[in-house]
Amino acid sequence: MAIKGPRKHLKRLAAPANWQLPRKVKAFTVRPSPGPHSMDKSLPLLLVVRDVLKYADNAREAKKIIQTGKILIDGLKRKEYKHPAGLMDVLSIPEMDENYLVLFDESGRISLKKTDKADAKLCKIVNKTVIKGGHIQLNLHDGRNQIVKVSDATKAEEDVYKTGDSVLVSIPEQSIVGHVAFGEGKLAYVTGGKHVGEFAKIVEVENRALYSDIVTLENKDGEKFKTVKPYVFIVGQDEPVISM
């Protein structure tokens, strides 16, 4: 019999390897709802509350906590326990004065890091288009689209945003307040591959026509390594522009 509609269940053994989740305790776990992040780069809010933050002993308790609306993602209340919290999302609990940034640890697992501020987040530009009216629409890594109004999109001085750059988005206003261009000398955060979770400076960018560009980086220990451009997330010049 054919499958009708999206899958609603997820076995623990089939869950992404980077989830911090015991595999053999039970058969099933929570499948994140379709949303701003892919399944391998996010965690359902229920797992964040129960398994990462340890604020609940079971799913029932975690659901009750989430349904109170006291947990915010990027400044917005999220009451759906399947909602995905993904890379660079800012998770806030105002009642406890706690803020967390969703990152990858050096084993590639999705983790939360405490942060001092929750007034902005970094977003990577993954694509951009010119829309009706001649304005530029930036497509960001977390599913959001930001429109940049320009008088002429063909002028380089107005079209300053490039694919691979990062923008600083204010929370909760969701407007662009900063821009970090992709290029040599910039500080990057590696989001995939052998060096996932590392901060490193871009040394060289090798442009390729048919494949992803190759980026050479140097970490704090002076070790140089190469990765593909989709794994490179620009976070600042010498230091990250947000607390990471």
UniProtKB/Swiss-Prot annotation:
One of its GO terms (molecular function) is structural constituent of ribosome. It comes from the Archaea. Disulfide bonds: none annotated. Pfam families: Ribosomal_S4e, RS4NT. Residues 43-106 form the S4 RNA-binding domain. One of its GO terms (cellular component) is cytosolic small ribosomal subunit. GO terms for biological process: translation. PROSITE patterns: RIBOSOMAL_S4E, S4. InterPro entries: Rib_uL2_dom2, Ribosomal_eS4, Ribosomal_eS4_central_region, Ribosomal_eS4_central_sf, Ribosomal_eS4_KOW, Ribosomal_eS4_N, Ribosomal_eS4_N_CS, S4_RNA-bd_sf. Keywords: Ribonucleoprotein, Ribosomal protein, RNA-binding, rRNA-binding. Belongs to the eukaryotic ribosomal protein eS4 family. This is Small ribosomal subunit protein eS4. It comes from Methanococcus maripaludis (strain C5 / ATCC BAA-1333).
